[in-house]
Curated annotation (Swiss-Prot):
It catalyses: UDP-N-acetyl-alpha-D-muramoyl-L-alanine + D-glutamate + ATP = UDP-N-acetyl-alpha-D-muramoyl-L-alanyl-D-glutamate + ADP + phosphate + H(+). One of its GO terms (biological process) is peptidoglycan biosynthetic process. Transmembrane segments: none annotated. It is an enzyme of class 6 (ligase). Its EC number is 6.3.2.9. It comes from Nitratidesulfovibrio vulgaris (strain ATCC 29579 / DSM 644 / CCUG 34227 / NCIMB 8303 / VKM B-1760 / Hildenborough). Its main location: cytoplasm. This is UDP-N-acetylmuramoylalanine--D-glutamate ligase. SUPFAM superfamilies: MurCD N-terminal domain, MurD-like peptide ligases, catalytic domain, MurD-like peptide ligases, peptide-binding domain. Pathway: Cell wall biogenesis; peptidoglycan biosynthesis. Belongs to the MurCDEF family. The gene is murD. One of its GO terms (molecular function) is UDP-N-acetylmuramoylalanine-D-glutamate ligase activity. Cell wall formation. Catalyzes the addition of glutamate to the nucleotide precursor UDP-N-acetylmuramoyl-L-alanine (UMA). Keywords: ATP-binding, Cell cycle, Cell division, Cell shape, Cell wall biogenesis/degradation, Cytoplasm, Ligase, Nucleotide-binding, Peptidoglycan synthesis.
Length: 433
């Protein structure tokens, strides 16, 4: 596993730079490339996705926006291509020259090359990234350090560079999508929380997904820190990680917390492992965890009515995430599940479902998948909408139970995204009589 820093050409004034996508990271990349003197061309398949404010800025800045299907001519003269995180690199290959083509780099990589030496904590993993980086940033701020928190969560790193302010530490959430096109990115602390099957609609296979995750460590050396969750040691050895290695696991050290579940105690340990590299004391770490508010849509308590707890875990989009959600509660669960199923072993959850789930209220798509796995294990019902499923669960719930929405699916059957799904759940709970 080697770093590609010797292979990079850099971006020079007058170079043509192509940005694919006009989401927040694409817009930030286009602005930074323009500031560096590049001639910027932005590609967007759907003109309706181009923000009006960006279109206005681009017109004044001389930045070209091309809408519609991609064409090889759009890339032929480019020195660099920056795809938005949701754009699979493989889908661009047919348009790129077979040899001597442009450097393809993530928005994160582009911004990294413009930093002024600020230390970076970068966190990846199949699940737990957002909670862990947010906890870590809260610990650092409790210690009195200035922190930029961003990347795959909220603010793109290019926006930080453009703003010009400087922080003591940058805490970055980074996805496999972004890592695939990072070539010189070198965090002071790099963290891999876990790996389970996910995003196989984007990656060619599980091996490509794992390869992407381990790109986070490829430019580190012995002066850096590599942090891993339990069970990853065989992979760490296989990829030859050079940095100092530390493994974290859940303990009771951070038991005073508003977060549910052992997995969140593990997330707190992971955050503390990184934060103490920058002088954060245990006292301040404990204070930070105790005052940390749960992240929206991640085992988020939205209400307690008549002794029944209502929990929104809309970010639960996989079977492995459902296991974690169910293990977080020691009281009976009425489970709301359903949506666009991404695959996974529902049968493997049968012992846990039998032990902890009193009833399953399905909604939306994938009804047949869940029923095939669990129809002989637990009582199941189905409703066309989430709102109907919430009302059904509320009427059946008893004092001391949990109504848990942990869908184990993508949200795109009925909703714009998992956040929209979580908001609908919250509104449905709030509307209960």
């Amino acid at each position: 596993m080697t770093c590609d820093k010797e292979k990079t050409r850099g971006i020079r004034p007058g170079d043509i730079a192509v940005v694919v996508g006009t989401g927040r990271s694409g817009v930030a990349a286009a602005r930074l490339l323009h500031a560096k003197g590049a001639r910027v061309r932005v590609l967007e398949r759907d003109a309706a996705n181009v923000p009006a404010t960006f279109a206005e800025w681009a017109a004044g800045a001389g930045v070209e926006i091309v809408c519609g299907a991609h064409d090889a001519a759009h890339f032929a003269d480019a020195a660099v291509v920056v795809p938005s995180p949701g754009v699979a690199v493989a889908t661009l290959r047919p348009y790129l020259p077979a040899t001597g083509g442009p450097e393809v780099m993530a928005e994160m990589e582009l911004a990294w090359r413009e930093l002024s030496g600020e230390p970076v904590i970068a966190v990846t993993g199949t699940s737990g990234k957002t909670t862990t980086v947010s906890l870590c940033a809260h610990m650092l701020r409790t210690q009195g350090l200035s922190v930029f928190l961003g990347g795959n969560i909220g603010t793109p790193l290019c926006e930080y560079v453009l703003e010009g302010k400087r922080a003591d530490v940058l805490v970055i959430e980074i996805s496999s999508f972004q890592l695939q096109t990072c070539s010189t990115f070198r965090p002071r602390v790099a963290m891999l929380l876990n790996i389970t099957a996910n995003h196989l609609d984007y990656h060619a296979d599980m091996q490509e997904y794992i390869d992407a995750k381990f790109r986070l460590f490829r430019c580190q050396d012995e002066d850096d820190l590599a942090v891993f969750g339990e069970g990853l040691a065989p992979l760490v050895d296989r990829y030859g990680v050079k940095a100092r290695r530390v493994t974290f696991r859940a303990t009771d050290r951070f038991a005073e917390s508003r977060l549910f579940g052992a997995h969140n105690r593990a997330n707190a340990e992971a955050a503390w492992t990184a934060a103490r590299e920058f002088g954060v004391t245990l006292e301040n770490a404990l204070q930070a965890v105790a005052t940390f508010a749960p992240m929206p849509h991640r085992l988020e308590q939205v209400a307690e009515r008549g002794g029944v707890l209502y929990v929104n875990d809309s970010k639960c989009t996989t079977v492995s995430a459902l296991r974690v959600a169910l293990e977080a509660f020691d009281r009976p669960v009425l489970l709301l599940a359903g949506g666009k199923f991404k695959g996974g072993d529902l049968e493997g959850l049968i012992p846990l479902v039998r032990e902890r789930v009193r009833a399953v209220m399905l909604f939306g798509a994938s009804r047949e998948v869940f029923e095939a796995a669990w129809r002989d294990v637990v009582p199941m019902t189905w409703d066309a909408t989430l709102e109907e499923a919430v009302r059904r669960a509320a009427s059946a719930a008893r004092q001391g139970e949990v109504v848990l929405m942990a869908p184990a699916t993508a949200s795109f059957d009925l909703f714009r995204n998992y956040g929209h799904r979580g908001d609908v759940f919250r509104a449905a709970v709030e509307s209960l009589a």
